[in-house]
């Protein structure tokens, strides 16, 4: 009898659970320094069946400055789109943030000339907090529309968790 199944497509994860089963995930904020930053256990009763992470340090390009935004949603497609949107909105204006046209960073980028983040300096706590709050507003809007269940936002050792309560 199969208790659970999952498919991991480079961090976008879809899963199925049988009655009485659970799926535990670990979240890593910085892929350059992989360490387990938090864990989440998703029981069968949870509406979550997909998760995804996005951020400027990841394999995909980002318009924002989040180290990582992990989203739990009813499907991995919803989680992927939401994580990208929220991570793009974890942002502030700062002269030390370096952005380049996406096509200059990756030849095959579908973002063309859109500026993507390539370097984020150490920011003051208030600046990090403001950037995270900007992303949190996007997460709250998606929760209100029942598109996602929760979002974990991380930047320079600060985290914010937004949940559907």
Regions found by a protein language model. Name each.
Residues 1-165:
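Mature catalytic core of soluble alpha/beta enzymes
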